[in-house]
Amino acid sequence: MGYLMKTTSILLVALLVLVMMFGFVGCQPTDETAGSSSDNGPADPITFTFMTYNVRVQVSNDADKRVPYDTVKDRAPLILQHIADADPDVLCIQEWTGNHTMEVAPSLEEQYEILVFQRGDFFESCAILYKKDRFELISTEHFWLSETPEEPSKSWDAEYLRIYASTLLRDKLSNKTFRAGTTHLDLAKVARGKQRKMVVDHTANSAEPAIVCGDFNFDARHDLYLYCINTLNDCRTLVTNATTTASYNGYNVDGQILDDDGAVKNGYGYPIDQIFVKRDAFTVHSYNVLNYLIDGKFSSDHFPVVVELSIND
């Protein structure tokens, strides 16, 4: 009888030890719960930083008209500083040229994959850069903003060939995919309106969460803007603390100074460099125009625009 009681006690102690061990293991955070808040509420959203930046082509007579340092080689350190300050995960660039490939790309290519999309009739291109360690490239696409988008062409009153280019990316942190698109619309009135509709409709009809950004050559006061915000969301209007300033500066040091009525003194009161997103697809956490000089100099005749956003479930 004593032997039986002793054996039973040993078994009970062993069972208790096992329960404690497995109970402790079961309480450890898993990969799925590690990012959750401590009160078992929803996890913090996984955000990424997105920038659009017209870096300006090199024009031979700019040194006479505007500033003495306006070559891409001179401006490259300033461009790179703006990029470093924002540290974008995805960067869409307009007016990228061979000069930028030589002077800017070497400092970025270790961290970023650089995809350049040629317009076809001119030396400038659109470029999309994304961090190699953060994103996986699934596919790319581009088409011309014309009545024959499948071939290099221009229509209506357009002065230049214009394109839309995009990448479909998978975020390795969230395992979500999204489309990042960019463009640079013409200045001609009819063409600009037609091109705007093409890129806005394409973004709205995307099967994935989609962004379209770039130099639209119009701001929020223009009638062309209404169709954009009736179809997509403007990131600038989705946050309460958005920077209120122009993105185009024209190498005018007063370009970022506001009058009492909110208009910029050089006549440009709102950004023409836009970031639109597909409705209900993203949450925008911040919006900024990097409207400052570097060492007293302009990096471009445009300031970069930066947003932080997350993809909705």
Model regions and ranges:
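Metal-dependent phosphoester-hydrolase catalytic domains
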Residues: 189-190, 201-210, 218-313
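Solvent-exposed loop/turn segments at secondary-structure junctions
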Residues: 55-58, 96-100, 119-123, 134-135, ...
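N-terminal, active-site-proximal structural segment of metallo-dependent hydrolase catalytic domains
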Residues: 26-106, 311-313
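Bacterial N-terminal signal peptides
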Residues: 13-23
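Structured beta-strand-rich core segments of catalytic domains in phosphoester-bond hydrolases
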Residues: 90, 94-178, 289
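Positively charged n-region of N-terminal signal peptides that target proteins for export
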Residues: 1-14
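Active-site beta-strand/loop signature of hydrolases that rely on acidic residues for catalysis
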Residues: 48-55, 79-102, 129, 167, ...
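Surface-exposed cleft-lining segments at the edges of enzyme active sites
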Residues: 64-68, 149-156, 182-189
